[in-house]
Structures are given as structure tokens and as C-alpha cells.
From Swiss-Prot:
Belongs to the V-ATPase V0D/AC39 subunit family. It is a peripheral membrane protein. Its main location: membrane. This is A-type ATP synthase subunit C. InterPro entries: ATPase_csu/dsu_sf, ATPase_V0-cplx_csu, ATPase_V0-cplx_csu/dsu, V-ATPase_V0D/AC39_subunit, V-type_ATPase_csu/dsu, V-type_ATPase_csu/dsu_dom_3. GO terms for biological process: proton motive force-driven plasma membrane ATP synthesis. Keywords: ATP synthesis, Cell membrane, Hydrogen ion transport, Ion transport, Membrane, Transport. Disulfide bonds: none annotated. One of its GO terms (cellular component) is plasma membrane. HAMAP family: ATP_synth_C_arch.
Length: 342
């Protein structure tokens, strides 16, 4: 019976892809971002306030100012957009969208716990939560008023309890790595029972590759040991298997970079003379191009929907970089280097 959920039909895929196409058409274009790069912060907020973000800018404008207004409005819009995507989908598409968006459960857990550790007011954390995963906003609001021990206890009986139970005995960055490992591990347990599911799982595995190659390069640059690197990687990649990762982690950085050139994600990547953050943006661009190509190859599938989900998050990230950069007077060229614009 579960395989029937995965199969769906052409008409069902055509419907959700058509809805997604309309939503995708409303995303800001590269020329919009280049226009925004020539504006001052207040002009940027006014400009964004006339786009898809108007509702959130208007609603939160009385509560926040400056880049915090932008942050909260962007995350609120992201949550609303993803919830709408779930609402208009059904069958196989709804199942897969919801599974993928469980990533935001991890985001919310991390932000709530980090907020508790830093004594941030619950209402401030509340505004950056994205209730797009398995749990609804009511659940996250109940956690906001609990202490860390009670929050951890709330996840007893779930896969996330294991990494969360180590809070206090391990660094928070390791807890975060553990939470994302659980998220991907649970996704990879899905059975590739038909072509729709295989496309979804290949997408997930390729996303893991992108995360892992970033981790490899970042930790190598920090002179981490092979064991330290492996602790931070996520098993189950598309080409970067655990065995491959172990070999790469043990290589000197120059040799490792040479070895990486044969993998799918190294197409047109230029890293010479670049800082790690700039290299990570190169891989983000490769990932977006790859998703776009695969979505075009399989237009009646989950891939165009996943492409939109990724592009929407990239748009929000770009607007945050732009807003904070302009607010603090960074040169436009420096801000643009930190953005993912194709």
C-alpha cells in the first residue's frame, strides 16, 4: 500500500508542478538583485515590501526595525510559502515535500536550544522559526517556554533524542551535526520502490555530497584530523561514499583537491586563491545548476518542486546577506561575492 503513495500519476504531478511554476515565476531575478545592490538599506526594505514579502514586512514593521525586520519578515514568508506548497499538494508529491521539509524541524530545534543557551527572549526566537516540517507552530511555541532539559525530553522516542541527549557533554556544533545526520539517515531509509522515489533519493544523496565536500574543504583548511573530518560528514552520498570520504580526508589538501576533480560536483568550480566561504558559494551554484538541469530532464516529477524549494531558500539567504551588508556599509562588490547569483 505504501508504494501506491509513491507512484502518483502524470496528472497529479502536472498539477503540483504547474502550481510550483507559478510560485517560481515570482522569485526575484538576477537583475533584481543587481538593482538592489545599488540601493541603500531603507530603499531595499521598501522595494521588498512591494514584492511577495509585503504581507510580512507590513505585519512585522511595527515590531522590528533595521535588518532584524528583514530577517523576521523573510523567515515568516519562507514558512508561509512552504506551508502553502504542502497545502496545494497531495498524494506522492505531498508525502515527499513533507519529508524533505522536515529539515526545518532540525533548524527550529537548533535555534530554540541556541536561544536558550544565549538567554534570548522567546519572542525573538519565535520570529525566526520556520514551521514547515512535521511539527506545527503550536509545538514549537510550547518548547519556547521550556528549559533545555524539558526540550530534550520532548523528543524522547524520536530519532532526534540521541544527539539531543548529549547536550552538556558535547559541543553544540557536534549536536547540530548529529541532528542533520539523523535527518538524512531517516530520509535514506525510504524505499526506492519506483522511479519517482528514486529521483527523490538521488536528489537527497547529491545534496549530501554538496554538504560533505564543503565540510571536507573547510575542515582541511582548519587542519582537522581525518577522524575529526569524518565525524562531521554525513553518510549516504551519491558519489562520495563513506569509503571515498575516508580516503579523501586522509589526503594532503592539494592531493585531495586533485582527487575531487573527477566528481559530478566539480564541474567548472574555480577555487584557486579563494577563501573557503567563496568556494562554498561555488558549490551552491553548481548544485542549483544541477537541480535545474535534472528538473528540466524530468518535468513531471518531484524535481521541479524541490528546485523551487531550494531556490526560495537561496533567495531568502541572498536578501539577508544583502540587507545586513548594506546596513553595515559593506561595499556592494563584497556583498555580491557573498551572494549566490547565477
Amino acid at each position: 500500500m505504501i508504494t501506491m503513495i509513491y507512484k502518483g500519476n502524470r496528472a497529479a504531478w502536472a498539477y503540483i508542478v504547474a502550481r510550483t511554476k507559478v510560485m517560481k515565476s515570482r522569485l526575484l531575478k538576477p537583475e533584481d538583485f543587481r538593482k538592489l545592490l545599488n540601493m541603500e538599506f531603507d530603499e531595499i526594505v521598501r522595494y521588498i515590501g512591494e514584492t511577495e514579502y509585503k504581507k510580512e514586512i507590513d505585519e512585522l514593521g511595527y515590531k522590528f526595525t533595521g535588518p532584524r525586520l528583514l530577517d523576521h519578515a523573510l523567515y515568516a514568508n519562507l514558512a508561509r510559502t512552504y506551508r502553502k506548497l504542502i497545502e496545494v499538494s497531495f498524494g506522492a508529491s505531498k508525502f515527499l515535500i513533507m519529508k524533505y521539509l522536515e529539515k526545518w524541524d532540525v533548524w527550529n530545534i537548533i535555534n530554540i536550544i541556541r536561544g536558550k543557551m544565549a538567554n534570548v527572549q522567546p519572542e525573538v526566537v519565535d520570529d525566526i522559526l520556520v514551521p514547515a516540517g512535521e511539527r506545527d507552530m503550536d509545538f514549537w511555541k510550547t518548547l519556547l517556554v521550556k528549559d533545555i532539559e524539558e526540550i530534550v525530553k520532548s523528543f524522547e522516542g524520536t530519532p532526534y533524542y540521541e544527539p539531543l541527549s548529549k547536550i552538556g557533554s558535547e559541543d553544540m556544533s557536534k549536536i547540530e551535526d548529529g541532528l542533520y545526520k539523523v535527518y538524512y539517515r531517516e530520509l535514506l531509509k525510504l524505499n526506492p520502490s519506483d522511479f519517482a522515489m528514486k529521483l527523490f533519493l538521488d536528489f537527497i544523496k547529491m545534496e549530501i555530497d554538496i554538504r560533505n565536500v564543503k565540510t571536507l574543504l573547510r575542515l582541511k583548511a582548519e587542519d582537522a584530523t581525518p577522524d575529526e573530518i569524518m565525524e562531521c560528514t554525513i553518510p549516504g552520498g551519491y558519489e562520495l561514499t563513506e569509503e571515498e570520504l575516508r580516503k579523501l580526508a586522509a589526503m594532503p589538501i592539494d592531493e585531495m583537491i586533485k582527487a575531487l576533480e573527477g566528481y559530478w560536483f566539480w564541474n567548472d568550480v574555480q577555487i584557486e586563491g579563494k577563501e573557503v566561504a567563496a568556494v562554498e558559494i561555488e558549490f551552491d551554484k553548481v548544485w542549483i545548476k544541477t537541480i535545474s538541469k535534472r528538473a528540466s530532464n524530468y518535468p513531471l516529477s518531484i524535481l521541479p518542486v524541490l528546485q523551487y524549494i531550494v531556490l526560495k531558500k537561496v533567495e531568502v539567504d541572498n536578501l539577508r546577506v544583502l540587507g545586513w551588508g548594506k546596513y553595515y556599509g559593506l561595499p556592494s562588490e563584497e556583498i555580491e561575492r557573498q551572494m549566490v547569483i547565477l
